[in-house]
Regions:
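A transmembrane-helix-recognition feature enriched in membrane-embedded lipid enzymes
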Residues: 1-61, 108-112, 209
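Residue-level preference for the first positions of well-ordered beta-strands
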Residues: 70-72, 139-145, 173
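Generic beta-sheet signal
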Residues: 97, 118, 145, 177-179
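A cross-family acyltransferase "interaction/gating" segment
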Residues: 105-108, 154-235, 249-263
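Membrane-embedded segments
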Residues: 78-136, 140
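Polar-ligand-bearing catalytic/cofactor-coordination segments
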Residues: 117-120, 219-225, 237-242
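Catalytic-site beta-strand/loop segments enriched in glycine and acidic/polar residues
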Residues: 135-164
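Conserved H-X4-D acyltransferase segment
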Residues: 7, 12, 45-98, 110
Length: 266
């Protein structure tokens, strides 16, 4: 039964992938000639995300109201599926690691939907913030994952604060989203994309699941006007932690060291 389920879902995913490539190629010349607006194309991308989740047998339940609006959107980060889940609910541009651009097919589609690619360790913060602000000025939502990497979901990792400058400089709202992959007990044993796992290995496990339900919790936007980025990042993290009803854990060693460095600088 598991083999049959995987095969059927893989076939459906392949069909949706080919459909995505066809749509992107057909719309490319129309977008260049401005016969199709970027907002319309982003709405199509959101529709495609929903089709892909359906092909994989994944259901999304939303708590709160997700209102498409220009701003910096943030979320906890557990899996590569996070992008499909959030993208299925609203047109949004993502900030993603540069490795995604090299993924077959997925990298092409991500580039077509205006993904901002971040190369780790390349000191690109200023360029990334500028690219995010350009999209904000054009009226788009831009989402990044402040944890900087995926985690198992036991707790929300420390947020990196630098990209919050994109919102602070333009007084753009911060829209907090919280993701939970339902399983009893938590966290989900299969979904987290961690421990140097390959994408194919993780996908293979996800496709074998009889059913996967994801809860996406939307919280009211936070004001970035006049905020200090580190304090804003900590406030955002706390909102997401409370939404997921996670305990405030003892700080992981890396965070303890970061706190000590901050005290020494002070």
């Amino acid at each position: 039964m598991t083999a049959l389920r995987r095969t059927w879902r893989l076939f459906r995913m392949f069909v949706v992938l080919m459909l995505g490539i066809l749509i992107a190629l057909l719309m490319l010349p129309m977008r260049r000639s401005q016969k199709v607006s970027e907002h319309f194309f982003m709405a199509v991308a959101s529709w495609w995300h929903r089709r892909m989740l359906g092909a994989m047998g994944i259901a999304v339940r939303v708590e709160g109201e997700i209102t498409p609006q220009a701003g910096i959107w943030i979320s906890n980060h557990i899996s590569w599926l996070d992008i499909l889940v959030i993208g299925s609910q609203a047109p949004v541009h993502f900030v993603s690691k540069s490795e995604v651009r090299r993924w077959p097919i997925i990298g092409f589609l991500a580039a077509q939907t205006g993904t901002i690619f971040l190369q780790r360790g390349a000191n690109q913060t200023g360029q990334i913030v500028s690219a995010m602000q350009e999209k904000l000025k054009d009226g788009y939502a831009v989402l990044f994952f402040p944890e900087g990497t995926t985690g198992h979901g036991h707790y929300v990792r420390r947020f990196h604060s630098r990209l919050f400058d994109a919102a602070i400089d333009l007084h753009a709202p911060i829209v907090p989203l919280a993701l939970r992959y339902e399983h009893d007990p938590q966290p989900h044993p299969v979904v987290p994309y961690i421990n140097q796992q390959s994408l194919l290995h993780n996908l293979w496990g996800v496709l074998a699941l009889p059913r996967l339900q994801i809860t996406l919790i939307a919280r009211p936007a936070l004001s970035a006007e006049g905020a200090e980025r580190r304090r804003l990042s900590e406030q955002s993290r706390e909102v997401i932690r409370e939404a997921l009803e996670l305990p405030a854990p003892a700080l992981p060693p890396a965070e303890v060291r970061a706190k000590r460095r901050e005290k020494k600088k002070a």
